[in-house]
């Protein structure tokens, strides 16, 4: 495990730590602030139980049924990244099956998987091109995404669109004290060990140990944030990483 890597330098070499200010930067939206409880229900973010309006440029990935091709000019005008547009080749059976999910798909001539904003959907509909559409995530079997999401071990039944379980997820704040048990350890262990420096901390035999000693509570030393990208279905963000500590926030675009 980690201790062997640290102690067996002949096999694994010296451990090189990567300073915070030399890590790759990501541009994400801080959707949850320190001390807030976040939950996602059918793509809508709830903060402390209240829904948050979608940003104007938020995108979701759709399967879109069109009555004509998406030309390079249309893609450029809509400001869609061309590499994000996937042309779907469907046989007659696949098309009939998709028509059960997308009204109008039976009469469509072209099918695409692509990210769209609400404004893009309106423009394509008003232009008479868009016959119908459906969010790609709704076609995935339940549990498909959960094993990849944070926190590992608690999110198996969650998805990108429905995240946080029944009670949501509490974002740590400086000075906030939590009760330590299995679930809270799974949620906050990365913050405690990796960001706040308590590397000799673990869960064993039903108890949490901080710095090698049994502990019932933990008080955070830093503020944390929950970050999400506006391309909601294709964003690597806090739904995968977990909380972002204050010293990892380097600025605003």
Range-by-range predicted roles:
Residues 1-253:
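Soluble "head" domains of membrane/secretory-pathway proteins
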């Amino acid at each position: 495990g980690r201790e062997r890597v640290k102690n067996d330098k002949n096999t694994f070499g010296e451990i090189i730590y990567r300073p915070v200010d030399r890590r790759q930067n990501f541009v994400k939206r801080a959707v949850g602030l320190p001390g807030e409880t976040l939950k996602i229900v059918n793509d809508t973010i709830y903060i402390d139980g209240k829904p948050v309006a979608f940003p104007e440029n938020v995108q979701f990935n759709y399967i879109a049924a069109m009555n004509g091709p998406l030309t390079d000019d249309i893609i450029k005008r809509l400001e869609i990244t061309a590499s994000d547009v996937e042309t779907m080749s469907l046989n007659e059976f696949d098309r009939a099956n998709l028509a059960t999910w997308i009204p109008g798909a039976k009469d469509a001539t072209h099918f695409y998987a692509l990210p769209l904003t609400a404004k893009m959907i309106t423009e394509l509909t008003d232009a008479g091109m868009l016959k119908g559409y459906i969010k790609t995530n709704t076609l995935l079997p339940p549990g498909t995404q959960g094993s990849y999401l944070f926190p590992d071990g608690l999110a198996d039944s969650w998805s990108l669109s429905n995240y946080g379980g029944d009670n949501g997820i509490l974002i740590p704040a400086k000075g906030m004290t939590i009760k330590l048990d299995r679930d809270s350890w799974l949620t906050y262990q990365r913050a405690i060990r990796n960001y706040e420096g308590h590397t000799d901390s673990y869960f064993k035999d039903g108890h949490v140990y901080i710095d090698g000693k049994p502990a019932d509570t933990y008080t955070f030393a830093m503020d944390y944030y929950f970050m999400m990208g506006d391309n909601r279905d294709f964003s690597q963000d806090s739904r995968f990483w977990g909380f972002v500590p204050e010293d990892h926030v380097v600025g605003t675009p």
